[in-house]
Amino acid sequence: MVKSKHLLIVYHSQSGTTSAMADAVIKGAKNPDINGVEVQVRDALEASADDVLWADGLLLGTPENFGYMSGAIKYFLDRIYYPCEDKIDGMPYALFVCAGNDGTGAIKSITRILKGLAIKQIQ
């Protein structure tokens, strides 16, 4: 029997728009046509380093606030950085960003932090 892969989805939504995006992401990740993937969903304020260490892949969702990621996502990244450093090298991740413009500020700020964890962005 093939071991299931683990996908962790972490997001933050204050107004509900990123939550609506996350619902679509979660629906896609849990599609019955996709086999062998176990999905866990966590709010950014509740997600932990243990959740990240469990995962084989990570999806992060954030609104862009003032050209930056949400404070809750930054807080999540601050909490998991050192416990996960050197333990998740090469883990694939992707972002979904809800923004009134192109979301570049949030994407750049998250990408800069995640480069330090040596995980690999996929598109």
Which stretches of residues belong to each language-model region?
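N-terminal beta1-alpha1 ligand-phosphate binding loop
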Residues: 2-32
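Short hydrophobic segments within beta-strands
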Residues: 10-12, 42, 96
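A short beta-strand-loop structural module common to alpha/beta enzyme folds
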Residues: 35-46
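Short, well-ordered coil/turn elements that cap or connect secondary structure elements
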Residues: 2, 34-36, 88, 116
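Generic alpha-helical hydrophobic packing signal
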Residues: 23-26, 42, 55
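Helix-loop-strand module that forms the ligand-binding subsite of alpha/beta enzymes
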Residues: 44-121
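Residues at the starts of beta-strands that form the adenosine-phosphate
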Residues: 6, 38, 92
